[in-house]
Each structure stands twice: as structure tokens, then as C-alpha cells.
Amino acid sequence: MALKPDIFIVNEVIGADKIQSYRDMGIPVYVVRLSTNIEEVKNEIIKLSVLVGEEQRGKVLVKKMNDKLARIERNIPKELHYSKSTVLVSANYTSYGGKGCMYDDICKHAKIRNGIADLGMNTGQTVNKEVMIEINPDFFFLAKPWKDNKAKDEKLLGEFLADKSLENLRAVKNGNVALLDEKYIFIGHQNCVWSVQKLAHLVYGDCVTLEPEEFLKGF
């Protein structure tokens, strides 16, 4: 409060009580909603840029996102579009990954199939071993913490591959089980374009070159 802000910009995850406490201080509050797809991210950027009087910078940032998404799509041969299926496995969020979440939309932009959504499951429904077996995907992505820990990463991958109930699934037999940083999965800002690049590269290989990742800005 010593800074005497003109407005508070807060994320809805802080909770209604905290948000109301800011409003009770007499300062306008803008609540950023959790984005469930890339289009919502773009819309939020434009709304925020207008709010702070920097609409042109917002437009520049959205253009950067669109240009990078278009580059990724151009590099994936059309005959490969949606030819491979994936399943996201998250030990901490076992009900994440179906229709209506950011991961599902990232898959769409990467031109890969989200096996969980293909099964008709919405995000919020549990992805257990029975679901994995029914889908029998081409790729498994195992969500790992943002902070690298080689021992824990190897343990996570080793335990999954050692599961006898999964050993005959296509992704396991073909060696297509990959660790995926959570920063590519649980993301609600402009760098979600790098998530699209990462997934497309993991599935379709070198036709999608890995551009160096940077935090995208509107200037």
C-alpha cells in the first residue's frame, strides 16, 4: 500500500476472500482468470494492455505468439496432423488432461491427438491405469517438477516403465515415454507457445525445430 497503486492485478487462485480484502481498501482490482486455452491467453493480454494504456504492446505480443504458432504448424507435414495420440500422466494431478484444459488445447495446436479427450473424458476425471490401457497411446508424457532433480526424474521414469500392467502398450514397447516439465503443462501466459513447440517436437521430431525459448514480450 505504500506504493499507492492505481489498480491491483491479481490471479483468481489467491481466493475470493483475499480479492475482497483488496477491494475493501478502496483500490480497483482486476482479476485474471485461469486460462484453459491459448485464445483465452491472447484475449487476457489484450484486455490487460488496454487496462494499463499499452494496447499496442499487447497487440505486438499477441502477434509474436501468432507468428510462432504459425511457424510450428507450417513445419508439421499435413499428412502427420493428428496421426499420433498422447496421454499425459501426472502423479500430482491425476484428474488433469482431458477436454477443456490448457494441455488439451496445446495438443490441438501441436496437431497431435489427446488420447484422454478422444475417449470423451473432461479434465477433472481421473486418469488411472485402466484409462491408459484403454487408450493405448503412441506417446506417454510423464509430468515432472519444474526443478530438475536427476535422481527423482530417473525414479519416476523407471517406476513407470517397470509397471507390468503397462508393458504391452504401444508407447512403452516403442520407447516413446518422455518426461515433460510441468512448465509446459500448467501454463497460462504467452509462453504457452513453447509448450506447443515442445510437444510437437517430441511427437514429430526434427521437422519442428526447437527455437531457443525466451520470455515473450510486447516490445
Language model features with spans:
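Acidic/His-rich segments in extracytoplasmic proteins that coordinate ligands and/or metal ions
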Residues: 1-51, 128-165, 201
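Extracytoplasmic substrate-binding proteins
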Residues: 17-95, 116-118, 172-219
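Short gly/ser/thr-rich secondary-structure transition/capping motifs
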Residues: 68, 120-124, 160
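Histidine- and/or cysteine-centered catalytic micro-motif in compact active-site loops
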Residues: 92-93, 119-120, 137, 145-146
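Short, solvent-exposed loop/turn elements at domain surfaces
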Residues: 95-98, 142, 149-150, 187-189
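Long, aromatic- and glycine/proline-rich binding clefts that accommodate carbohydrate-like moieties
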Residues: 160-178
